[in-house]
Amino acid sequence: GDPYVLMLERLALPSLGSSGSAAEHLGDIDPRSFPALDVDIESLSIGDKNYGRVGFDLRTDLFGAHFLALRGQVLGIDLGDASRQNALHWWYQENGRRGSQLKGKFAVRDMGKVLSSLGYERSLETRSGGFDVNVSWPGSPDQWAMSASQGRVKFALKNGRFLKTSDAASGALRVLGIF
């Protein structure tokens, strides 16, 4: 049948906390059981942090859940609009193993603001940039870890400069250096 349509002006979720219990519960979910949904949230916050505007079309099949047509702007990253092929896949295998994949082209204006929103020191600033991503990792989407990821990330940042920062900011620059 037709997907349910969910349009929210605001969605405020509690902080996940440091216990990790919420992540353990997500790992127990069979992503194939989700209903078909077209979701648009104007303002998403988790705990005290506002993530921005997000939307997706959720579909499931025998292989898992597929968050298609990612759209909106989250933490300064432009997810695109419904016409793009940006997607997050949550795979399910019969042996109970799960995996996730993020695939698409995403844009940023000021990479410094993105770094800051992710908890890093603002070590560079840009006027524009883009990322072409095809990355997968074991587990549910919230279990992403760079060390467990495989795939490719291509990026181009334009009209920018590195800023003088503390030694702590070198961690963010090392992240860029990995790619």
Language model feature labels by segment:
Residues 3-16, 31-50, 55-179:
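Small-residue helix/turn framework positions
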Residues 17-31:
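Long, charged amphipathic helices and adjacent flexible linkers at domain junctions
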